[in-house]
Design a protein with these regions (language model features):
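Cap/insert and terminal regions of metallo-dependent hydrolase folds
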Residues: 177-229
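Binuclear metal-dependent hydrolase catalytic cores
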Residues: 1-172, 181
Length: 229
């Protein structure tokens, strides 16, 4: 989706952690034949100022990138370590054939990646494994090429995770709470992407109603919901 002449966001998936339909679920949505009720795990490509930035890389990544409008990628931003956001990282190997591929995440996320993918980070890695540069970030803005990225710390139940601001876009997923300080920083942003899991309460994700309340506080020009059942 083109927001303006500079920024484009392509949603690779907007589903919850199990995807939609969910295995073993026989609710109306999961039995639906409507293609709009088919959702892969939440991920997006942000194209801005010539850079192609992937946000999250879940278990559906290979399928998602093969059907994307372009498969060019320059970097990966991770929101957090949960499997539905990192399980596709091994499939980044084609992007590291010619250069080491950068991944930006909180230090605790990168440390867990080293534990989960030890074959990528040995002194003498096996030929063909992904060559990854794990870049630790804090709450300060950082550069991905010529693009400034600002972390947006939010809570996922009791887990501190990151949303990201890239130019006119803020992308927030898996959030259950955003502090007043972060809300203040986002007020008036042109384009907001935020999770809205369902109408029923959930301990670690915003409901549709809670997401709408955040939207009313931030007052973006355009809002898209993601990470939905």
């Amino acid at each position: 989706m083109n927001y303006n002449s500079e920024l484009e966001i392509e949603f690779l998936g907007t589903g919850t952690s199990t995807g939609v339909p969910s295995i073993g679920c026989h609710c109306k949505v999961c039995r639906s034949k409507d293609k709009k009720d088919k959702r892969l795990r939440a991920s997006a490509i942000v194209r801005y100022k010539g850079m192609n930035i992937l946000i999250d890389c879940g278990p559906d990544f290979r399928q998602q990138i093969l059907r994307a409008s372009s498969d060019n990628l320059d970097a990966l931003l991770l929101t957090h370590i949960h499997y539905d956001h990192v399980a596709g990282i091994d499939d980044l190997r084609p992007y590291s054939f010619n250069h080491i591929f950068p991944i930006y995440a909180r230090p605790e996320v990168n440390q867990q990646l080293r534990t989960n993918l030890p074959y990528c980070f040995t002194k003498h890695p096996y030929p063909g494994v992904p060559r990854l540069d794990l870049v630790d970030i804090d709450n300060n803005p950082f550069m991905v090429g010529n693009v400034e990225v600002t972390p947006i710390p939010v809570m996922h139940d009791k887990l501190l995770i990151n949303g990201y601001r890239i130019g006119p876009l803020a992308y927030i997923t898996d959030c259950s709470y955003i502090s007043p300080e972060e809300i203040e920083k986002l007020k008036g942003i042109p384009l907001l992407v935020i999770n809205a899991l369902r109408h029923r309460p959930h301990h670690s994700h915003m409901t549709v109603e809670q997401a709408l309340e955040v939207v009313s506080q931030i007052s973006p020009q355009v809002t898209y919901f993601t990470h939905m059942c």
